[in-house]
């Protein structure tokens, strides 16, 4: 999955939030521009301003932008904290957010939490609760790749938790859906030895 594309998508979504106060709009726009330019210090400053807004939607978008800034810098613990605050504050919940939360938890080796986020994102995708991915991706390709990544990571989480039966089952289901994935074929072979 091209995570850079995912980051830009999330940043663009941040700009789409309705803003009334020009200061808020400027912070969102400046934060997105700084993030896209790789100026993480400036992006962080702008998104932090946005988190201080009294309007919960604006504040939530600030936390999401802040999370993306941390994520891009591979500060996964801080990114996960910011994503949690975004969700708690009322950001529009999408499969993408739960995928990124799952990746952050995996990077910090909290596989139980990662599994919860991944499964929440997959459930959301299956019931099409968010609908955001289809609207915001070119012909759904990005969304399909993200779902595949999440299913792969679900197997990895079960493996890291030494839950061999669930890992085997999910690997088998994955290979039915994605039969040409040689990495998962090797993973499934390994799991059969457990």
Kindly label every feature range from the protein language model.
Residues 65, 99-100, 146, 153, ...:
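Canonical tetratricopeptide repeat
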Residues 25-26, 59-61, 68, 95-96, ...:
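Start-of-helix register in tetratricopeptide repeats
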């Amino acid at each position: 999955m091209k995570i850079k594309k995912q980051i830009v998508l999330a940043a663009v979504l941040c700009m789409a939030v309705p803003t009334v106060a020009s200061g808020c709009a400027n912070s969102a726009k400046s934060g997105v521009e700084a993030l896209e330019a790789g100026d993480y210090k400036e992006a962080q400053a702008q998104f932090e301003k946005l988190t201080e807004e009294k309007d919960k939607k604006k504040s939530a978008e600030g936390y999401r932008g802040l999370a993306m800034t941390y994520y891009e810098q591979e500060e996964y613990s801080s990114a996960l904290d910011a994503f949690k605050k975004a969700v708690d504050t009322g950001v529009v919940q999408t499969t993408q957010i739960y995928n990124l939360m799952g990746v952050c938890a995996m990077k910090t080796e909290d596989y139980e939490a990662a599994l919860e986020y991944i499964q929440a994102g997959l459930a959301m995708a299956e019931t099409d609760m968010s609908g955001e991915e289809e609207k915001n991706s070119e012909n759904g390709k990005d969304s399909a790749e993200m779902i595949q990544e999440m299913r792969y990571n679900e197997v990895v989480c079960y493996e890291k938790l030494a839950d061999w039966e669930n890992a085997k089952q999910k690997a088998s289901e994955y290979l039915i859906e994605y039969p040409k994935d040689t990495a998962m074929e090797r993973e499934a072979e390994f799991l059969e030895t457990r």
